[in-house]
Amino acid sequence: SPLVHLTLNLISLSFVSIQFDDKQYYKPKFPKKYPFSFEVPKYSELERIDNHLNLNFKKYKAKLHISYFSLENDLKRHTESSRRLAFKHTSKANSISEIIYQNDERNVYGVKFDFDGSTATSTQFFLTDSSNHFFRGALYFNTQKSDSLAIIEEYLKVDVTRIIETFCWK
């Protein structure tokens, strides 16, 4: 079936039905100024805003906010800034896990931060080639954080992982 159907019991005798799309991906055409490519889910919409991109998951009321920077001997500044932005959520997080990513063949290295708890974001990451490029993403929901979002967060984290795994520099 084209849709996966899941029913969650949120509160006794109260149910919500969520229709998840099949996981299908494609590689969008990025403007030449962006020296990277990666796969995105077909149910997302790529929005270009100045030097930033958003990957909009309208159905799930979420956006992956994306930033790209050319490095000018400032890798440390960008990695520290990304870590600071991630750990800004420490007070609300039950835990923050760091997953190191390394793909020598594609010259892509980075860290993914997964948050558990009542944080504004459920996952953030950065990717770099360590010399010329720095790419950062942060997933935010356009709604109040609640336990009912947990299943959607996990569903979209799969997409973030796919972006990281298919990411390459041009």
Where are these regions (language model features)?
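Extracellular-facing segments of soluble proteins and assemblies that are Gly/Ser/Thr-biased and enriched
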Residues: H65-E72
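Poly-acidic low-complexity segments
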Residues: N73-L75, D129
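Glycine-rich, often proline-containing surface loops adjacent to acidic residues and nearby aromatics
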Residues: Y60-H65, F134-A138
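N-terminal targeting sequences that direct proteins away from the cytosol to non-cytosolic compartments
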Residues: S1-A62, L75-T79, F87-K88, A93-E105, ...
